[in-house]
Amino acid sequence: MVRIKDVADYVGVSTATVSNVINGKEQRVSKEVREKIKKALDEMGYVRNHTAMMLAQTTSNMIGVVIPHKDGMKIALEDPYYSAFLGNLEYEIRQHGCYMYLIAQQSEEEIIRQAIAWNLEGLIVCNMPADELNSLSEKYSRGIVSIDSYIENQSDVINISTDDFGGGYQMGKYLIAQGHRKIAMLADNDDTVDHHRWMGLKQAMDEAGVSISETDHFLFSPSESVRELQMEQFFPDLQNYTALFVASDFYALEVSSFLQSKGIRIPHDISIAGFDDLLYAKLARPKLTTMSQNMGKKAKMAVEALLYLQEKRKLERQKQKQNATLKPNLIENPDADNPWTLPVKLVERESVRRIV
């Protein structure tokens, strides 16, 4: 690897002079010498050591992204939701001249250790339980943006969420409008996101006078092997419903595949609807009716929220009298009362049929 000293010796200048050119401090170097150094850098194939440069600076331009570990999955990226969201998040981070540093959720101590070791600008934390997130925020002060954690926004923590209750409510109203009265929900937990979707569904059905209870709420394991056994156990009961609302597209497609393997015709015998509107939803057969959340906007909001916290922290350090305020219109969110909550919309495809 070519070093700064090698370039300096080649041109016949000091290492400080070469360093000034590399770091954009060209006003300190004559035009003639500057051009010689740049030519030498190209000819010798010099590549900047970004790791060393980052550790030497007060800022790293690296944003930490913490993704959860899901029981039964080797890596969270096996879940297509996280793959899609992280792709959008990396793009938005890059648009702001920063880099994404991915942390698969480990202990609180390990998250903080990596954040400090890599001088991260802040953390975007996905689906961390509220108690763990509150504990982390007490020990890490550079700013945290949580995704779908359902905590109260704090001075150094902002939660970005989807209107999960509204999504469940809209789906319930839609299924009822299609003539369905025997509706069940399937999910892998009854916490945070999935809980709010279930409560929204219940609200819609209660308003319509349609009976629904906890016996219509099927919870299965995040572990695929365990889930397969549970679906076999659920199958006799699932045949009593005309429509199934599944908490994610990933699980909805899995449920659809399982039922079709048992000879159930989708949607003729049982209708199925999901949540997220992933790419696979429109590629499935039949194409999946689902609630769509705008992952691109969600990622954009997350990065802007973290940059807002950075700016606020900077102003506080400078002891300026006027606090920074991020106006809701900067994130192009029509809901001014809940600027950090994303609306959802129904996408009607082929997996739900109307019952006459």
Residue positions per predicted region:
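Hinge/beta->alpha junction and helix N-cap segments in small-molecule ligand-binding domains
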Residues: 72-81, 99-110, 160-170, 186-230, ...
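Alpha-helical recognition/docking segments in bacterial nutrient-uptake
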Residues: 2, 62-173, 232-240, 250
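N-terminal helix-turn-helix DNA-binding module of bacterial transcription factors
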Residues: 1-59
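Short acidic capping loops at alpha-helix termini that bridge into adjacent secondary structure
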Residues: 182, 212-216, 266-271
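Flexible loop/turn connectors
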Residues: 228-356
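Short beta-strand segments enriched in small/hydrophobic residues
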Residues: 19, 55-75, 174, 182-188
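An alpha-beta-alpha
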Residues: 169-208, 326-352
